[in-house]
C-alpha cells in the first residue's frame, strides 16, 4: 500500500474509484461519473491554486493505492480562512466502499499528519459518522465543539489535529 499525490497517470484507476463511490451514493462522485477525467484534472489544478472556487484555498489530493486500486482519497487544504477554520476543516477524506472498515482512513490521516501538514489543522465530520469520528480521534484529534452546518444541513463535530 502506498499513498501518493494525485496525477493524470491515475486516471484509469480513478475512473474505477469514482464509479464505486458513485454507486455507493457519495454525492461528489455521482456528478463526476460522466467525466472522471475532468474531476481528476480539477483536483490536480486545485493543488496548484488553479480554478479554485471563491473562498477556497489550494488543496492537494492524495490516493491510497494497493495493487493498482485506489482504496481511499484524502485532500489537504492549505492556509487559513473562516470557512476552513469554522466549517469544512483542512482535511477531507473518504474510503472506497469495498475498503471501509479496514483502517484505510486511519492510515491516510496518520500519513498526512506525519508527511504533509506543517501546523495544527482543523478536521470535521458529521456527528452521525462514528467511523470518521474514531479515525480522527485515533490520529490524536482533540474535540473542540459541534455546530450546525447551514451549507450541508447537518450537525458537525470539529477537531484540532496537531503535527507530530
Q: What is the role of each PLM region?
A:
Residues 116-127:
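Conserved GNAT acetyl-CoA-binding A-motif
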Residues 124, 142-157:
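Conserved catalytic-core motifs of GNAT/GCN5-like acyltransferases
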Residues 128-145:
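Conserved active-site alpha-helix within GNAT-family acetyltransferase domains
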Residues 11, 85, 102, 130-133:
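Loop/helix-junction capping segments adjacent to catalytic residues or to phosphate/diphosphate-binding pockets
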Residues 92-95, 101-114, 134-138:
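Conserved acetyl-CoA-binding loop-helix of GNAT-fold acetyltransferases
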Residues 1-90, 115, 152-164:
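GNAT-family acyltransferases
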